């Protein structure tokens, strides 16, 4: 493992490095200088009383949905364990769930721990940041969050803008790709200078501000009981990072959402939808200039933390967009790393390109551009550009054929 220019080999040193990294990430409270007046965004308030109803048969129904042998958390219990022993453990589990519903979180921390297992993002990863953290959550906490996720899933479609497709039933990643593809082709056909800004959000799930999350939930109409349960689950959570199969020192969470928790993705997109509302509102009141004389449904595309924004390449729009991103980052903890972002010019002249390079400290790229795993282009793809996709599908065919064999 590398720490700067130093190579460390002892388990104790690597464990200390991993602990420091994640303690500064999830074990440090989010500092907030500003927040957002959500009332100014004009988002509706929903009737969500049904989410606060007592838990009943849905507990057992959720257990029946649990994968039987999925990797367990620190307690070692799998879905199969719950199903096999339900007649024995039913009363205790139902009592524990009822305690949570009533706002009694005493000793919940014992049932809300997790292991983080590190999955390499690339070949020969040598730094902690080059590993993706996946949480293996305690079975009880995972059961409760799955129950809450099942309740919320049916309401997300009406609560989250249509340009966010992640984690919502009957929405697909292709929707976002096609929306951006059609918009960039249309803008190119208009022969007017425009840009597509593709953002990199830093450590998205790990840095969500709990205070901002609760502000968003209350503004949407979530009741006090639901918000209290979310508070209890967040504040009682702890994590140990697995290194060579050995759990490290425990980290008490102070911010962020677990990757591997069934409810976390849904809470995350509710937070991200505020960014969409900010850009939409700025467009409606004329702070951002229109992209075309013809109406374009969305100037921003969101797929989880994947953000793409269409703008006019002028100083006012670019500076305002950076200010909106900065405000959202300060309020929510989700900061755009502009240096790691990309900007793609559409029909831009030399003076436009010079202005873009002066105001946006990010790499400027050309189409075709890989977006959500597919080549985004303003022209018909050549055979050479399509070939990598064909090769990738060909590599998958043997596995697909094996799945069809009985």
Give, region by region, the residue ranges found by the protein language model:
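Conserved catalytic palm subdomain of right-hand nucleotidyl-transferase polymerases, strongest
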Residues: 1-2, 69-77, 116, 126-136, ...
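Surface-exposed loop/turn segments and immediately adjacent short secondary-structure elements
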Residues: 1-129, 143, 369, 375-376, ...
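Active-site-proximal segment of RNA-dependent polymerases
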Residues: 33-58, 103-115, 122, 154-207, ...
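Short, conserved micro-motifs composed of acidic
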Residues: 39-44, 49, 338-367
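Inter-domain linker/hinge segments that demarcate the starts of reverse transcriptase
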Residues: 53, 57-64, 92-102, 116, ...
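Catalytic palm active-site di-aspartate
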Residues: 73, 113-116, 132, 164-166, ...
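Conserved polymerase palm-domain catalytic core
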Residues: 201-304, 312-315, 319, 346, ...
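Basic, alpha-helical interaction scaffolds
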Residues: 357-406
């Amino acid at each position: 493992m590398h720490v700067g220019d130093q190579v460390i080999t002892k388990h104790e040193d690597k464990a200390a490095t991993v602990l420091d990294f994640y303690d500064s990430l999830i074990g440090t409270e989010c500092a907030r200088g500003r927040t957002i007046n959500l009332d100014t965004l004009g988002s509706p308030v929903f009737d969500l009383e049904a989410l606060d109803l007592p838990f009943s048969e849905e507990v057992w129904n959720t257990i029946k949905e649990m994968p039987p042998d999925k990797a367990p958390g620190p307690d070692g219990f799998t879905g199969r364990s719950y199903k096999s022993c339900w007649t024995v453990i039913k009363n205790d589990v139902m009592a524990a769930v009822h305690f949570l519903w009533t706002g009694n979180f005493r000793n919940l921390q014992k049932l809300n721990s997790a292991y983080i297992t590190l999955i390499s993002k690339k070949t020969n990863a040598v730094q902690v940041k080059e590993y993706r953290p996946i949480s293996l959550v305690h079975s009880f906490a995972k059961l409760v969050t799955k129950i809450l996720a099942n309740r919320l899933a049916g309401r997300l479609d009406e609560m989250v803008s249509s340009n966010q497709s992640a984690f919502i039933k009957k929405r697909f990643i292709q929707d976002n790709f096609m929306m951006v593809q059609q918009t960039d082709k249309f803008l190119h056909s208009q022969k007017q200078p425009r840009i597509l800004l593709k953002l990199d959000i830093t450590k998205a799930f790990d840095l969500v501000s709990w205070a901002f999350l609760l502000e968003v939930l209350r503004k949407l109409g979530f009741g006090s009981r639901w918000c209290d349960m979310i508070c209890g689950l967040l504040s009682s959570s702890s994590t140990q990072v697995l290194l060579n199969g050995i759990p490290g020192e425990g980290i008490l969470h102070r911010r962020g959402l677990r990757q591997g928790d069934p409810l976390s993705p849904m809470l995350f997109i509710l937070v991200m939808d505020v960014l969409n509302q900010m850009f939409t509102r700025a467009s409606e009141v004329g702070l951002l200039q229109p992209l075309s004389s013809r109406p374009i449904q969305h100037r921003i595309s969101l797929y989880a933390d994947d953000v793409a924004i269409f703008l006019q390449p002028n100083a006012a729009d670019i500076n305002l967009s950076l200010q909106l991103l900065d405000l959202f980052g300060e309020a929510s903890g989700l900061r755009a790393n502009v240096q790691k972002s990309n900007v793609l010019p559409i029909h831009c002249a030399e003076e436009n390109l010079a202005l873009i390079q002066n105001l946006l400290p990010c790499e400027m790229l050309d189409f075709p551009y890989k977006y959500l795993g597919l080549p985004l282009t303003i022209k018909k793809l050549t055979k050479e550009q399509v070939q990598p996709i064909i090769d990738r599908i060909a590599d998958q065919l043997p596995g697909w054929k094996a799945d069809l064999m009985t």
